[in-house]
Amino acid sequence: MFARIARINPKILPFVIGAPTIALCSYYYSSGAFLRNESSKVFIGDNNWIDLPISRIEEISHDTKRFTFKYPSQDSVSGLVVASALLTKFVTPKGSNVIRPYTPVSDVDEKGSLDLVIKHYPDGKMTNHIFSLKVNDTLSFKGPIPKWKWVPNSFESITLIGGGTGITPLYQLIHAITKNPNDKTKIRLFYSNKTSQDVLMKKELDELQAKYPDQLRITYFITTPDKGYKGESGFISKEFIASNADKPSPKSHVFVCGPPPFMNAYSGDKKSPTDQGELVGILKELGYTIDQVYKF
């Protein structure tokens, strides 16, 4: 046997030895890449809070700002999935924890930072705190909080019904669908606000609608329109939904997000973060079932 090995052509010996070596190196390389990808995720679902500094503050409207928070590394990514949220926390001077959930509007795969669009409520403990922060100040985060697990092409079409700051998870869903060339889901967004100045993410939404006119259709509703306003005024009516949303069907789905009065009018609010509760309101009156509606 050894004589046979000795007679192997020396010209091919490096290739005989090299094949398993390459396979072994390939395994370690791919394993290392996987570990690096995993370690680059900022939020991994553990119970630890992480403090992130503010790197930028952009004023969007009279009561809304976009806050950019910097990750520990420029190569870090969120670790979030589409339509998931994060918990934020600060400690009051008396030592009490104030914790609130927020959905980032930045891409879940964006490197280096995340963006929150936050509306200031005068009686809101968290929004008062965040609006008092300056660049380089920090805020504590934990997550992710998974919500709806989006699978491309799960439905032929979806209807998104949003009010005010409820646009954030809906925008994240719109952005994820439209950026995926293999996801052919049709999207209708009905978005309600008090005034034209209150419409959040309008620039981004309009750009997406212009870029994907065959896939995304947006209707804005203003309840107290300015003089000369030419869009839809008033609330998102039962009649409008009946005429413009898909009829209840396994091939379509409805997603709703907004403040409590808004939720109560259209779908009813959730019982808890993990319990959707029963379906009530306009969507139930139109024949939808709880299996066809998701409340963010």
From Swiss-Prot:
Binding residues for FAD: 154-189
Subcellular location field: Mitochondrion outer membrane
Keywords: FAD, Flavoprotein, Membrane, Mitochondrion, Mitochondrion outer membrane, NAD, Oxidoreductase, Transmembrane, Transmembrane helix
Pfam families: FAD_binding_6, NAD_binding_1
Residue ranges annotated for the FAD-binding FR-type domain, each copy included: 47-151
Family: Belongs to the flavoprotein pyridine nucleotide cytochrome reductase family.
Role of this protein: May mediate the reduction of outer membrane cytochrome b5.
Protein name, UniProt field: NADH-cytochrome b5 reductase 2-A
